[in-house]
UniProtKB/Swiss-Prot annotation:
Protein name: Autophagy-related protein 32
Keywords noted in UniProt: Autophagy, Membrane, Mitochondrion, Mitochondrion outer membrane, Transmembrane, Transmembrane helix, Vacuole
Cellular component GO terms held in the UniProt record: mitochondrial outer membrane; phagophore assembly site membrane; vacuolar membrane
Top-level taxonomy: Eukaryota, Fungi, Dikarya, Ascomycota, Saccharomycotina
Main location: mitochondrion
Gene Ontology annotations of biological process type: autophagy
Transmembrane segments: 396-416
Biased composition (Low complexity): 24-36
Topology in membrane: Single-pass membrane protein
Biased composition (Polar residues): 165-183
Organism: Kluyveromyces lactis (strain ATCC 8585 / CBS 2359 / DSM 70799 / NBRC 1267 / NRRL Y-1140 / WM37)
Amino acid sequence: MSGSKGVWGAPPGNNNRQLYSLDAGSSGSGVSASSAQRHSILDPHDSVMDLLNGQQSCAFDSRLIQNQDLIDRKGKSNNIDHNDINTHTHSKGLTDSWQAIDRDEYSFLNAGNHNNYHNTSNGDFNQQFGGVLSSDTSEEEVEINAAPSPNLSASQQHNQFLAYPLSSTGFGDQGNSETTVHQFSDGDPVKSTKTGQFSKAELGAGTGEDETIMVNLGHSWAGSFFVMPKLSLSESMKRFKILILSDGDSANSFYNRLSRYHRLMFDVGKLNEASKEEALKYTAFMIIFSDSKKVTTILNRMWKKYGDFTLIPICQKGQKQSVTEKVKTFANSNKIKLMSYPVVISDHYEIHGLLRHLHSLYVEVDSDYETDIPKKTKPRKGAKKKPAPHLAKRWWFWPISIALGVGIGCCVTFYFSKFETSSYNSSVGVIQTADKEIDAIVDAIEGNSPSILEESSPQSISDFLGQVCKLVKDTAIQINELLKQFLSAHLMTSAWIQSIGKEFMQPDSQSTISKVTALDLVMF
């Protein structure tokens, strides 16, 4: 063991610092750190230390003798008392217990450098290995000092540590192969240049009190992560906003005429003053054209600066037709998108309709749902329609009703025409009677022979009902004869043959006529 080895943060030739100090601060912190570690409830292996020491007594005694020799050589220069020596030997047992049980679990801490890492406080270690879990799904940023990502498993962290060793700002290799220099940076400028040099041959692989401290810090590193959402203020939510532009003061005057209810949708600006980044925040541009001749120039200039955009054109009185034609030309070339057709600024009715349409869009976009909800009107009590009768729903009801009505009308007409004919025939028969019959009728009318009238008049009600029944019977017979005459006149065999055509006629006309006659009989 050579006594020329460098110590933590000490300049060449100055060996007044402690070699086994657990903190980069004062020399008296070693006892407190070791006692806190020995009696800490976070150390699960303190209770089994005696069992492990019994099995590893041989190896422990040999290492203890070497450490005692090293301490005796540097005891005078470093002013190490016996309490620190006992504390170090007891911590040495804790180190062996850790290495015997959970060495593989924290192997990634020593994968880059086989040397031990000394004099790192808890804040410095978290600065090197700390990380933040974020709910953002964007691409992960490169961690400072190539810290392992907390989203990786233990095996993936080990592979990442081997592939990308820590940079020189955290742990760097300096000097020859026998000596390794570890640099740690903290917020204090006084302690920013702390370095430590230890020989691999002096400390050995996987031994030393400082390795136990690193393992304990690994526990705190594993439990120090917290979840914080990653908020981005560069890209805020795009809302419904319209920028009013004009080449004069028309935009300000138009904005001042609006009510406070509608001013929330608009901002005022001048042509070509808004940058391209600011223009992306607006839904559309409302341009007030003072002259129809400048429409093409203004739109070309804005298209070259902002690209395709949404336009709400406002024109002056008498220029609506020319502005409409020029705006449609740009819309057909896919340079602009029209939110509305040109509106005359002096027409209050058109301006009011435009503002009402824009406000409905503003409310719809701001609330993220459709505002036009169909209203359900309750039917009035008196507005209920009466259900149609069951017979009216049948298609065959109306044809039959019409046929019966026409038939009854024909029957009544035929009856009255027949009654007029019978009365005319009876009057002619009376004229042709004999003279004695005429005299008898005249006497009966004058009242000279009432017996004749009594015989001709009905004697009782039964005789009257008989005459009525006879009249109904005669009427039915006459209607039957009328129907037969009508059907025979319109549905004759010759008529059927003529309607079919000349091609229906055959050389054997008798058989054809007999078949058609049989068909007529079936129908009748």
